[in-house]
Amino acid sequence: MNISDNYMPVILDTILADTIVGCDLYIQNFVNGEIRYILYCNGTNTIRSEKIEELQKHKIEMLFIHKEDQNKYLKYVESSLKNIIRDNRINIIEKAQVVYQVAKNIMLDVFSDPRSGIHVYRAKNLVEATIDMIITNKNASLAIINILSFDYYTYSHSVNVAILGLLFSKYLGIKFEELNVLGTGLLFHDIGKTQIESEIINKKEKLNEKEFTRIKMHVELGANILTKVRDIGDVSLFPVRQHHEKCNGKGYPNRLQGDDIHKFGKIASIIDVYDALTTRRSYADAKKPFSALNIMKNEMEGSFDDELFTKFILFLGQRSEK
């Protein structure tokens, strides 16, 4: 194994002066043509401003950590996420990458313990930070969408749906306060799947009728979890309860039609299906955006709100033109 396989880069500007990162930080060097990693700051020590200034003086933009310490680093970054987002030295692509990695890390914890108030609090802070990034960076849409994972896991799908849904909602002109409420609902839209047997969730073949009936229960199971969590309002539950409802009344769990479905539920439905189609599954390759939209338009006719779906196509088209 190459020594580089044990390390991963982290952006220097995500390390704040006079803080304890919690994991060892290394500098990459070349000795006799070979890569070496030299310990620069012990994870239990405070990294002083002089050390950071020294690195900046030598044009060093990346430090390195052991891959096994990624979770520690992401927890550290999470605690200063809003500062990172507002730091003009960090470009939007790097900000998007940091936010996305932190988001996936949080949702892994959420799905392992969905009733934890601490994890919910972390997730809500993440939504606020993501909205902050989207609002303060005009090029956020292109940067963020380009780093979304193409591999389907329930936790990464939840992050994709939340981020893409927030970008689309900003495009629609939805205000900050509503974005916050909507983003929380989108992030937790599949939380009920934590209560479904893993063999059903991870099954590679088509589900039988009994299994499909069981997995449809994730909607109400998710709503039940969140109604018992403090600080999750009723409006945030619309994406959770209604992301499988269809405007033609053929969805579940309540076969709602048209305007009986809340706008946030309609948005969640579009984004949920689009992300599912454009991510790689064990039983299906990821579809290209145009192909996914074509399937949604022609093979799922009547499922989505016509006006919102048209605007979603325009939203994606606007992004691809930049």
PLM region descriptions:
Residues 1-148, 152:
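Non-catalytic interface/linker regions that flank or bridge core catalytic/transmembrane domains
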Residues 101-322:
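Histidine- and acidic-residue-rich, metal-dependent catalytic cores
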